[in-house]
């Protein structure tokens, strides 16, 4: 039985990876171009007029945040659009009636989102080498933060895909929730620059912890304790996973 589950999992993974690789011009190139513009405008043009941040140039400071931003948006978008597309075309019904556990379905879609997020993250990292020298303080924290964040936002994208009723619903969360939280998550600034009230308010933003942990992996500096960073990641991953599992298990909005 486990062999059959493994075959099902690999099949979903293969389908999801083939899906975004087949249209790589739409899925991989745009985020690379967008991040390149960020590097040029904020890093070179504006960054040259801004002083050092915690002993690093402004460009070095924002690179980890921009990489994380690309991972978050692409992991989320991949699963949200793919799962809703399967639901819209009623392909998901075939998967639900097949002898495939809900855990396998979730792992398959999340695996595809993680793959796209990491792939884009690697491409953006490669582009950043044209602007700043490569520096890693801890590979363990870089890899751990990157993978956990990609898993979390893949689950969030799956949740969006379950609730979405139209294709417009797929863009609502990224536009009104994800983008503001990312920009206010410390990508372009350190929390220490904010007044105490806004520092405290920023700690309610979960993306702050992810960017802080990822920046520590590269530069060895962080705005929040690492234990808190990984605690927040694990709690959100478990919560989102259980919600997704419950909704798919009950077929909420999936069965006609």
Curated annotation (Swiss-Prot):
This is Inner membrane transport permease YadH. It holds the Pfam family ABC2_membrane. Residues 22-251 form the ABC transmembrane type-2 domain. The gene is yadH. The keyword Lipid biosynthesis does not apply. NCBIfam families: PRK15066.1. Its main location: membrane. It is a multi-pass membrane protein. It is found in: Cell inner membrane. Belongs to the ABC-2 integral membrane protein family. Residues 1-22, 74-94, 138, 191-223 are periplasmic. Keywords: Cell inner membrane, Cell membrane, Membrane, Transmembrane, Transmembrane helix, Transport. InterPro entries: ABC-2_transport_permease (IPR052522), ABC2_TM (IPR013525), ABC2_TM_bact-type (IPR047817), ABC_2_transport (IPR000412). Residues 44-52, 116, 160-169, 245-256 are cytoplasmic. The keyword Transport applies. One of its GO terms (cellular component) is plasma membrane. GO terms for molecular function: ABC-type transporter activity. The chain crosses the membrane at residues 23-43, 53-73, 95-115, 117-137, 139-159, 170-190, 224-244.
């Amino acid at each position: 039985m486990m062999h059959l589950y493994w075959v099902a999992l690999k099949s979903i993974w293969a389908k999801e990876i083939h899906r975004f690789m087949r249209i790589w011009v739409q899925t991989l190139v745009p985020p690379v171009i967008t991040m390149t513009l960020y590097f040029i405008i904020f890093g070179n043009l504006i960054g040259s007029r801004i002083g050092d941040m915690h002993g690093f140039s402004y460009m070095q400071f924002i690179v980890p945040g921009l990489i994380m931003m690309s991972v978050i948006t692409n992991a989320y978008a991949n699963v949200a659009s793919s799962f809703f597309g399967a639901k819209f075309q009623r392909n998901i019904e075939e998967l639900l009636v097949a002898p495939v556990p809900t855990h396998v379905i979730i792992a398959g879609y999340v695996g595809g989102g993680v793959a796209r997020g990491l792939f884009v993250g690697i491409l953006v990292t490669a582009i950043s080498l044209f602007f700043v020298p490569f520096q890693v303080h801890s590979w363990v924290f870089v890899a751990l933060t990157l993978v956990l964040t990609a898993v979390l936002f893949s689950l969030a994208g799956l949740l969006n895909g379950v609730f979405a009723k139209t294709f417009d619903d797929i863009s609502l969360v990224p536009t009104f929730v994800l983008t503001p939280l990312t920009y206010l998550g410390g990508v372009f600034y350190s929390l220490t620059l904010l007044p105490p009230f806004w520092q405290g308010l920023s700690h309610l933003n979960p993306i702050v912890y992810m960017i802080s942990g990822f920046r520590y992996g590269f530069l060895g500096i962080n705005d929040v304790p690492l234990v808190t960073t990984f605690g927040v990641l694990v709690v959100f991953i478990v919560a989102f996973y259980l919600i997704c599992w419950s909704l798919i298990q009950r077929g909420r909005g999936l069965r006609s």
